[in-house]
């Protein structure tokens, strides 16, 4: 009984940053040959797979989104900089992951559609970049690997999520 409760507690703790009614699907490799094709072929996920998921499974899928990550990105404002990962996300990312916007807003549908160069940064990142100059981050432009992004939101998670992530529109990161 004690071990069972421990496992349940560990699962609840590890999933506290994620909606319990969500799943993640990752690309991979085939394990069996099929129709004359060899095993070990790479399975790629494309944008139309996301659209098809919502279209063909409306009774089971409330919403679908995708993420893409670009790691080790230097983000700077003036002389200050941090090294973070840019996460390209859909607006519904906050329905699945517990990212709480403390100031400003999160990525929205217009940002995604228009491939806007907007960014949502962690409060710790904002403190590093803007703290010395006492500049209000919302509306300012930061440089991320030579691309200027306008800060539209600040998030402040208390969970295990790293402060080393910033969020931009999925479509924007795909085009860079």
Regions found by a protein language model. Give the residues of each.
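A hydrophobic alpha-helix feature that marks transmembrane segments and, especially
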Residues: 1-3
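Hydrophobic, regular-secondary-structure patches
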Residues: 5-85, 92-95, 127-128, 175
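Mid-to-C-terminal secondary-structure elements
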Residues: 87, 92-107, 111, 115-176
């Amino acid at each position: 009984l004690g071990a069972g409760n421990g496992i349940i507690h560990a699962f609840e703790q590890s999933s506290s940053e994620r909606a319990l009614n969500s799943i993640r699907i990752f690309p991979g490799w085939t394990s069996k040959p099929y129709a004359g094709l060899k095993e070990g072929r790479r399975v790629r996920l494309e944008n139309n797979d996301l659209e098809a998921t919502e279209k063909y499974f409306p009774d089971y899928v409330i919403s679908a989104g995708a993420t893409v990550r670009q790691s080790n990105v230097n983000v700077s404002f003036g002389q200050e900089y941090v090294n973070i990962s840019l996460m390209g996300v859909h607006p519904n990312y906050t329905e699945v992951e517990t990212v709480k916007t403390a100031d400003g807003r999160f990525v929205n549908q217009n940002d995604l559609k228009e491939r806007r160069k907007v960014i949502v940064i962690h409060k710790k990142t904002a403190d590093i970049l803007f703290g010395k100059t006492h500049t209000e981050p919302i509306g300012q432009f930061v440089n991320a690997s030579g691309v200027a992004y306008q800060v539209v939101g600040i998030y402040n998670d208390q969970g295990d999520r790293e402060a080393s992530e910033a969020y931009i529109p999925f479509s924007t990161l795909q085009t860079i």
